[in-house]
Amino acid sequence: MTENNKSKLGVLIPGMGSVASTFICGVIACNRGLSKPIGSMTQMGSIRLGKRTENRNPLIKDFVPTVDMNDLVFTGWDINQENVYDIALKSKVLKNDLLEELKPHLQKINVLKGVFDKKYVRRLNGNWVKSGENKLDLAKQVMADIESFNESSGVDSNVMIWCGSTEVYMEPSEIHLSLDAFEEGLKSNHEDIAPSMIYAYAALKMGIPFANGAPNLTVDIPALQELANKTNTPIP
């Protein structure tokens, strides 16, 4: 058996919509004893040790040094200015009575201005979006957001999980083939660099693991894989 990791983990979420708000509500509800983490491998899954007949099946969270759910700290970005309570209420995924119990906690989670390009999500409009000189500037703004969050929250490390809308399908282009080309593309505002790639670049540049929760191209390009290798950062 092993002791739980006692550090605080920041969960950075680009795209604070139905998926993200439901995830956050679920974690907080579990932490307050209002629900159970059904479906969570780390929290409810077990691992078999030795032979089947030995009946040694500890929970994964007791065997691997995972961060306790109470030590998860959330922040994120979106293209509309709402707090997580308002987003969850509008999404109509969870029951209102549960949301009312969680309301004080959810309202504290403010949403940061998002990186937005209508070319990649044509049916959406944003009123809470970043502006900058170029896409490199937008990436630097995301990194500044993360640094500010680190200071205010006291987290020890972070992960980033893309929960935004699925972007339009695209094939890799020359700008995606190397890190040098990609960074030049950021400076020149190249149209083939999607918002999800800007977030991923910012995360990987800071050594923050990036998980893609949508079938976007994002980190499935040589440029960002090169950056991940350079900073020794996972891209699961």
Model features per residue range: what roles?
Residues 232-236:
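A glycine-rich helix N-cap at a beta->alpha junction
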Residues 1-214, 218-230:
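Metallocofactor- and cofactor-centric catalytic cores in central/energy metabolism, strongly enriched
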